[in-house]
A protein has these predicted regions:
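A short helix-loop-beta-strand connector motif used in the catalytic cores of GNAT acetyltransferases and
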Residues: 55-68, 75
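Acyl-donor (CoA/ACP) binding surface of acyl/acetyltransferases
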Residues: 1-36, 69-191
Length: 191
């Protein structure tokens, strides 16, 4: 299955490249996008460029990675066709799982785009490597991210502290489409 260009009912999902740097940086530098994990915010274009480098390496290694989401048509004044609504997709991590990732601009949140993109990404990952579990790791206070994981058919398989998070009271939830080995959970929950 070709995964670098997918179409859904409302979205065009394309591989993120350095041509997207300005829009990717604007998304990842937006404090509203990172309200659940402020330490993740990109404070420089160089950090966003390094992020795109890692995406491109992942495409070469995995055959799937992070996709940019653009509306296939105008969806109103705040969401004209062709703009980058966000990024998301599935990436192979630890050679043992598909990590489900999604991040939307504030204007694009609350319209069902995350669920639409996640379904396409999960279907593509399952076609490429059905032997790997689909996993989403989310912060407990990020209710919308939890809802997206649940809509993708994932179930909570772990809850505990979020090591490495500057907020020592943060709680991490791991969702998966099947039971995970103790070893993989241990790997996912280390700092």
């Amino acid at each position: 299955m070709e995964c670098s260009h997918l179409l859904t009912e409302r979205l065009i999902l394309d591989a993120v490249t350095h041509d997207d740097l300005d829009q990717v940086h604007a998304l990842h530098a937006d404090p509203q996008v990172w309200r659940h994990l402020p330490a993740g915010r990109h404070d420089t274009r160089e950090r966003s460029a390094a992020y795109i480098d890692s995406i491109e390496r992942g495409w070469a290694a995995d055959g799937a990675r992070i996709l940019g989401r653009r509306p296939g048509r105008d969806l109103g004044d705040s969401l004209p066709g062709g703009i980058l609504l966000g990024v998301g997709g599935c990436t192979v991590r630890h050679s043992a799982m598909w990590n489900l990732y999604y991040r939307l601009s504030p204007a694009a949140q609350g319209h069902g785009f995350a669920a639409e993109m996640v379904k396409a990404a999960c279907d593509a990952a399952a076609d490429l490597r059905p032997d790997l579990p689909l996993v989403a790791s989310v912060l407990a206070h990020n209710r919308s991210s939890q809802a997206t994981a649940l809509r993708a058919g994932l179930k909570q398989v772990w809850r505990g502290p979020d090591p490495g998070n500057p907020d020592v009271s943060a709680v991490r939830l791991i969702y998966a489409d099947r039971p995970l080995s103790d070893g993989l959970i241990e790997t996912l929950t280390r700092p």
